[in-house]
Amino acid sequence: QINHASTMQDVANAASLIHAPGLNIMYGDSLGNIAWWAAAKLPIRGTAVHPTIFADGSDPAAQPQGWYPFTENPQSINPESGFVASANNQPDSTRSGIFFPGYYYPGERWNRIAKTVTSKKDWTQESLEDLQLETINEKSVQNADFLLEQVSQGNFEKYEDILSELAEWEGDHDLGHTAPTLYYKWLYHTLRLAMEDEIGKEGFESYLQTFIMIGSTSHFFTHEQNKWWDKKNTSTKETRAEIVAEALKVSLEELTQQFGEGQGEWEWEKAVTVEHPHPLGAKKPLDKLFNVRTEAVEANEESVNKLAFKLNGTGIYKVTSGPAMRILLDFENVEESVSVLPTGNSGNRFSKHYADQKELYVEG
């Protein structure tokens, strides 16, 4: 129905038919209308049911008591702000005032989009390209500043250059910069030293893969008396500052061993790898034939141009997800619309269009 829609209401009606999985439907037309709908069939739960705890399916009280009408779903139609955006964040555009639970990301991307879009009115296709390619994460800057506050930099005089770089970091992930290289290594070891003794190595590595880690790290850092800071296997009680300092020491030693004594050589580019997998490339040696490798990209977590990776202790970060397509469409000049795919239009390894867009995707 969406493909055959001729009005905004037609699209809304079609979106109301989507039950699961939940989708964000974004809309715009040549008349200047814009809209966003959270499309899903949302259950009405009893007060005794908690969305994050397993429920007894045999208990009638745990069953849905009904379904909210689509008109109560989170949505935004021609808002006064003049824009709509979605970045897998907790929506607040609900008519009923209900905040529906879900696996939402923290909101850094949406906040950055909203902040940037509302900062100017003279948007052009070129400036929108810049926004789509932006790799700034303001929350990471806050985390880095907090970590730096916990240590006496006089104890790390040998590493004054890299610490100064991190102190001046604005959250970008430019490939030639060194601040991200230190930040993510330091972040990993701080969390590891705080948590691994309580939940074990396997549990900690599993924790790093969760939404909880992404959403709670800043809050975790702010609790000085948090019991996580104390190591269970020692007779003394470690403090937050001691754990953060130890994590920095380990991080600097590992980066020196990994990239050399010259701190200016610790560029983010050297810590990032990119490979677009093909179903037939899952097993070696077919990966060398079917998978598409590219130059390094500005890997990051939760920026507008999200090129995500899993935090780990190796100091090498493999990009695991990114924009499936970038597209800019001007309804006043549709013929000049532009788009790019991560690799190419064809899934046929022997087609000339199999990977002919990979460089353009990397460069933007």
Which residues make up each language-model segment?
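C-terminal/peripheral segments of proteins
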Residues: 1-164, 168-364
